[in-house]
From Swiss-Prot:
GO CC terms of this entry: cytoplasm
Gene giving rise to this polypeptide: acpS
Family: Belongs to the P-Pant transferase superfamily. AcpS family.
UniProt-recorded name of the protein: Holo-[acyl-carrier-protein] synthase
Entry superkingdom: Bacteria
Taxonomic path: Bacteria, Pseudomonadati, Pseudomonadota, Alphaproteobacteria, Hyphomicrobiales
């Protein structure tokens, strides 16, 4: 069953401006060490950071909290599966909110898609609950 859906559009130029103006102060407040490492490897850092920013906003919307109720930027981390597919790793208040959403006998699955077409980056998040089975 679908528990939450969130989407966000982010202006890449806005993120690039924040990177120029605030530098590490911005990236350390919003992004995890892993996200910063991945983004900083890229020649075009702005779109990479913007996609992740949009993912965090979309996730907060799917959780039903926005950036409040104990959910913070760094509680949501964009990571990649071995296949390269992006997904989200939740910690802290985001993980706690997710646990409150999931009915007994179910486990959460998070689905994430990211894209950009300058000047915009977009993310879409679906939170799904699936029954726990002996083979899960």
């Amino acid at each position: 069953m679908i528990l939450g859906i969130g989407t966000d559009l982010c202006d890449i130029r806005r993120i690039e401006s924040s990177l120029e103006r605030f530098g590490d102060r911005f990236t350390h407040r919003v992004f995890t060490d892993g996200e910063r490492g991945k983004c900083d490897q890229r020649a075009a850092r702005g779109p990479s950071y913007a996609r992740r920013f949009a993912a965090k906003e979309a996730c907060a919307k799917a959780l039903g909290t926005g950036m409040s109720q104990g959910v913070f930027w760094r509680d949501m981390e964009v990571v990649n599966l071995p296949s390269g597919q992006p997904t989200l790793n939740l910690t802290g208040g985001a993980r706690e909110q997710l646990a409150r959403m999931v009915p007994a006998g179910h486990e959460a699955r998070l689905h994430l898609t990211l894209t950009d077409e300058p000047p915009l980056a977009q993310a879409f998040v679906i939170i799904e609950a699936v029954p726990i089975t002996a083979t899960s």
